[in-house]
């Protein structure tokens, strides 16, 4: 079993380590693979096949997004590390698997090398056959299409010949950079019960955000009568989403989560017949489907949901993973790539309200309210507060440091050096933080581009670049 939940994080709350219970470990090792991945998920309408035979998921790995730079400098949004041991796309793939949807296509294009590698290593073995899989579809050029994908709709249109391989009845379209837990079975059942052509997931309990996936006007029967995206209307506040239509019935404006269930026939008709020039699902296909008279419904979701589309959102999502996002749910485990890493080692570390990933080496340090990723090394007398340490790809030994020091004049080991202090910062992979370094945003800068010095500032958060070297005694 190559896909596993073996890389469970270690979570600390007020010095008391919360571990997976022994029965949970027993379950992880002994749980029958067929029970886990091929449950009997017949829906309320008995004419439909189980979801693992009737629904295919299409997951977008994420395009170029300047709001997440520099985290997307060398990786796509879906490949960004989250909560110490995982990648963002793992949350969406896990939702599919836990819901019994085991035909999963991941469309990738922008900076896709690390994402393609992660998906192929993490999920290549769970299928037990050609009809249960996570298949990566990388952007391609052909004699007919010599350009790259021009948008979400264009990507699906050009890959329809792949998606049509199996006789599924619905496609579940998912962004790969959202953090949430959802039972897609309920969504599919709602879609089928209402006999909708398209069902859009709406968010009923989120605070005001600048929603990139748009707003939908929903009537009393949950029918979507209008769909607008950012730029076509002003941001609607939570308090003013209800309105009265011209016929006297009430409607409300609901933010879209960018999650769609689309019937197979409707998908083909829209992309190949009605809207053959359209490139984007949210701004063109959904409004076009409403104009064509298709039945578009809303399915409301009131759980935790975060669109990780900015540095601030990424920071919030990690902090939320400490407080309330449950990784220890036996019914809805979070899967990722299995790794052969040892348990984290701690000498006299003081750790509170934090998550520590696998294989960390923590000396006499203090960690408060932080996420510490895999293979992180933190030296003596270091204080880390309200920060995200992404981790490292390798362990670097003293002899490696001495050798590299002679070759490249790099004398700082990967990790965080003695007596350094890090507060409200993001330290990307393989960064070298010297001794007595202060990463505290001393001047309270909101936005700053200092890549030559190895860091940038976004929304008041300092981001240390991947592979950056911060010299001893630096104050940022």
Curated annotation (Swiss-Prot):
The keyword Cell wall biogenesis/degradation does not apply. GO terms for biological process: glycogen biosynthetic process. Its main location: plastid. InterPro entries: ADP-Glc_PPase, ADP_Glu_pyroP_CS, NTP_transferase_dom, Nucleotide-diphossugar_trans, Trimer_LpxA-like_sf. GO terms for cellular component: chloroplast. Keywords: ATP-binding, Chloroplast, Nucleotide-binding, Plastid, Transit peptide. GO terms for molecular function: ATP binding; glucose-1-phosphate adenylyltransferase activity. It comes from the Eukaryota. Residues 1-55 form a transit peptide. Expressed at very low levels in leaves, inflorescences, fruits, and roots. Heterotetramer. This is Inactive glucose-1-phosphate adenylyltransferase small subunit 2, chloroplastic. The gene is APS2.
């Amino acid at each position: 079993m190559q896909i596993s939940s073996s890389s469970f994080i270690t979570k600390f709350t007020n010095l008391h380590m919360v571990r997976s219970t022994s029965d949970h470990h027993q379950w992880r090792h002994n749980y029958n693979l067929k029970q886990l991945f091929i449950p009997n998920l017949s829906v309320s309408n008995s004419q439909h096949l189980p979801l693992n035979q009737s629904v295919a998921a299409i997951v977008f790995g994420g395009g170029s997004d300047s709001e997440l730079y520099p985290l997307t400098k060398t990786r796509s949004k879906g490949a960004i590390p989250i909560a110490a041991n995982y990648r963002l796309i793992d949350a969406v793939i896990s939702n599919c698997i836990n819901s019994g949807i085991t035909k999963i296509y991941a469309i990738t294009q922008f900076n896709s090398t690390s994402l393609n590698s992660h998906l192929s290593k993490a999920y290549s073995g769970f299928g037990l056959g050609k009809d249960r899989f996570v298949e990566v579809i990388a952007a391609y050029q052909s004699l007919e299409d010599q350009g790259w994908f021009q948008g979400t709709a264009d990507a699906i249109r050009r890959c329809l010949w792949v998606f049509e391989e199996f006789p599924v009845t619905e496609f579940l379209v998912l962004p790969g950079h959202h953090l949430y837990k959802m039972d897609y079975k309920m969504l599919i059942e709602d879609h089928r019960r209402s006999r909708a052509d398209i069902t859009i997931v709406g968010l009923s309990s989120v605070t005001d955000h600048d929603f990139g996936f748009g707003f939908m006007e929903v009537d009393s029967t949950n029918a979507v009568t209008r769909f607008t995206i950012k730029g076509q209307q002003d941001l609607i506040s939570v308090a003013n989403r209800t309105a009265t239509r011209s016929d006297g019935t009430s409607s409300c404006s609901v933010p879209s989560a960018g999650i769609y269930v689309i019937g197979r026939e409707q998908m083909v008709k829209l992309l190949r017949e009605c809207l053959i020039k359209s490139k984007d699902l949210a701004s063109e296909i959904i409004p076009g489907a409403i104009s064509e008279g298709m039945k578009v419904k809303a399915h409301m979701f009131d759980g935790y949901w975060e669109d990780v589309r900015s540095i601030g959102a990424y920071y919030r999502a990690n902090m939320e993973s400490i407080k309330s996002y449950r990784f220890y749910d036996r019914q809805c485990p979070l899967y990722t790539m299995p790794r052969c890493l040892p348990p984290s080692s701690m000498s006299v570390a003081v750790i509170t309200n934090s998550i520590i990933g696998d294989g960390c080496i923590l000396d006499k340090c203090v960690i408060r309210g932080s996420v510490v990723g895999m293979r992180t090394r933190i030296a003596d007398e270091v204080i880390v507060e309200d920060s995200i340490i992404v981790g490292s790809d390798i362990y670097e030994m003293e002899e490696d440091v001495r050798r590299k020091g002679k070759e490249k004049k790099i004398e700082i080991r990967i990790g965080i050096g003695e007596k350094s202090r890090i507060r409200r910062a993001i330290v990307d992979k393989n960064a070298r933080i010297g001794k007595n370094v202060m990463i505290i945003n001393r001047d309270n800068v909101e936005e700053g581009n200092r890549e030559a010095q190895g860091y940038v500032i976004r929304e008041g958060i300092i981001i240390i670049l991947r592979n950056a070297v911060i010299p001893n005694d630096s104050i940022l």
